[in-house]
């Protein structure tokens, strides 16, 4: 993904792969109040853990006071009410879990934050400290007969030559949420369906 380039986080961090230091924010009065929501998809496919860990995924980072990050547990990118669960050509059924109730509530929270100064709830996300942010092969998915379990994430690496691309020599460590005994993500916003 072209947007997967350091800096990933609103916290100021140093990137050992590129030698750069930076943040998505400038650290001045122009920085917005920011709420970012992510589904499980963003953790597995786009490296969303890099929003709240150092680039090598060794420690949680403290986000600035004007930034919140929320993972909506057990949801997929583009999930919606009434989405079909028929697997189509895929092995596993599609996920019918709808993230929109949380997104709507957080939009109201953002409006209240901007208009009246009422801060939204603290970030809700998996963390290294809490033991809920793990390597993709350490999630703890229970065995489900006939179901394939993903054990790898998409690689996130510093961008190279877009004309004559070569495989990256190094990549960032992307992590995902640990699951509970039922196979549901153990952290983030767990909506009533979960």
Go through each PLM region and give its residues:
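C-terminal His-loop and adjacent cap/lid subdomain of alpha/beta-hydrolase
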Residues: 1-194
């Amino acid at each position: 993904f072209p947007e997967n380039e350091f800096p990933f986080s609103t916290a100021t961090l140093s990137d050992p792969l590129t030698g750069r230091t930076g943040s998505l924010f400038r650290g001045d009065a122009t920085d917005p109040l920011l709420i970012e929501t992510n589904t499980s998809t963003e953790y597995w496919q786009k490296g969303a853990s890099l929003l709240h860990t150092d680039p090598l995924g060794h420690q949680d980072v403290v986000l600035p006071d004007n930034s919140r990050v929320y993972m909506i547990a057990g949801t997929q990118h583009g999930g919606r009410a009434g989405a079909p669960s028929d697997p189509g050509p895929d092995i596993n059924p599609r996920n019918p879990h709808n993230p929109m109730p949380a997104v709507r509530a957080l939009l109201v929270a953002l409006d209240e934050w901007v208009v009246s100064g009422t801060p939204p709830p603290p970030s809700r996300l998996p963390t290294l400290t809490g033991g809920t942010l793990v390597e993709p092969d350490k999630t703890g998915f229970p065995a489900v007969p006939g179901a394939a379990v993903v054990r790898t994430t998409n690689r996130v690496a510093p961008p190279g030559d877009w004309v004559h691309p070569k495989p990256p020599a190094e990549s960032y460590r992307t992590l995902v949420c640990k699951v509970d005994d039922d196979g549901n993500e153990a952290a983030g916003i767990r909506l009533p369906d979960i």
